[in-house]
């Protein structure tokens, strides 16, 4: 059995299929972990959702910011973004089943050796705090409070963690950390605007979340997507897998057991 972890699909279904063919992926023997943003600007978001759902227990998925936006659109709280190609989902006969399945997915998934999330883990959190905050929000996503959360989650504040945060403030910080974060200010506050590569930003102003000097060390590696400008940052304990397939880059996947990296160039 092999464990494969892949970055943001964003509806690039054909590239995903070619990548899985490269490694002779078998749903009966292997596991596919997907680091969020299954849907959005690629041409086949509907096909991607159907395929990943069909894998059952052979797939491990975490929610990304585009997945949450899809839920908000489905509730009539947001409109489809101009560049998104998710409209076919809303006219699909299995729309309800797909969206229900999506809402059951976590913000944080855990392996014996690593954790996976879409954007990252707050540098001010230890792993237990990350687990607890994820579970709090996941419980709401799976409840009748989902529309309330989706309507109120869009905010850049609070941007600094404090254990005393509660209610909506706590949920917003958690969602922003797991699905939107890239840089932090030197004092640990989250920045929600800059998408540049780290080498183009002064560390006196902004620091990648995983390089903050006061970051709490974690006992497991962190695998994530979201930040295409990192172009597949990989070191021992921090592995970024978004390489911008939807922007004409490539889709990147790592086999955990031997750390071999596989890529598939964008087809369009």
Swiss-Prot record:
Identify the domain of life: Bacteria
The yes or no answer to whether the keyword Repressor is present is: no
Q: Please name every pair of cysteines joined by a disulfide bond in this record.
A: none
Q: Keywords of this protein's UniProt record, alphabetized?
A: Hydrolase
Catalytic reaction annotation: P(1),P(4)-bis(5'-adenosyl) tetraphosphate + H2O = 2 ADP + 2 H(+)
Pfam families assigned: Metallophos
Extract the GO molecular function terms from the UniProt entry. bis(5'-nucleosyl)-tetraphosphatase (symmetrical) activity
InterPro entries in the record: ApaH, Calcineurin-like_PHP_ApaH, Metallo-depent_PP-like
Q: What class of enzyme is it?
A: hydrolase
- This entry's Enzyme Commission designation comes to 3.6.1.41
- Would you identify the family this protein belongs to, as annotated? Belongs to the Ap4A hydrolase family.
Protein's job = Hydrolyzes diadenosine 5',5'''-P1,P4-tetraphosphate to yield ADP.
User: NCBIfam families per the record?
Assistant: apaH, PRK00166.1
Give the protein name, as stated in the record.
Bis(5'-nucleosyl)-tetraphosphatase, symmetrical
Identify the species of origin.
Vibrio campbellii (strain ATCC BAA-1116)
